[in-house]
Swiss-Prot record:
Name recorded for this polypeptide: Small ribosomal subunit protein uS11
Gene3D superfamilies recorded: Ribosomal protein S11
Domain of life according to the entry: Bacteria
Role description: Located on the platform of the 30S subunit, it bridges several disparate RNA helices of the 16S rRNA. Forms part of the Shine-Dalgarno cleft in the 70S ribosome.
Subunit structure: Part of the 30S ribosomal subunit. Interacts with proteins S7 and S18. Binds to IF-3.
PROSITE patterns: RIBOSOMAL_S11
Keyword rRNA-binding: yes
Gene Ontology CC: one annotated term: ribonucleoprotein complex
The UniProt record lists the keyword S-adenosyl-L-methionine: no
Pfam families: Ribosomal_S11
Keywords: Ribonucleoprotein, Ribosomal protein, RNA-binding, rRNA-binding
Gene Ontology biological-process annotations: translation
Gene Ontology molecular functions: rRNA binding; structural constituent of ribosome
Amino acid sequence: MAKPAEKKTKKKIKRVITDGVAHVHASFNNTIVTITDRQGNALSWATSGGAGFRGSRKSTPFAAQVAAEKAGRAALDYGVKSLEVRIKGPGPGRESAVRSLNNVGYKITNIIDVTPIPHNGCRPPKKRRV
């Protein structure tokens, strides 16, 4: 009987990156934290929904804190020491995500707000009537 063909698997090489960029996208419903290298290649990411929060609890500052912590710990494997934080969006998890990344042990070099602001572009959604 013929022997099964041996599968050749390539071992994934972890590269060592000393400084990265943390992209925090804080919407009203969720918070997404992505840690990339300087070129924009993603090293790790986490969301408040993926951290176990559902419904209205996804949009809390604590959920953003847990998501940032999760993404930060995953990026430590690459040897990231310092982060530049880019915050986008008006959500409630903006400050708590940055504070959480600081508590994980990263040296935060600078914090930039990259929220897109229209120069009178699209018409905004109608106001809520509660």
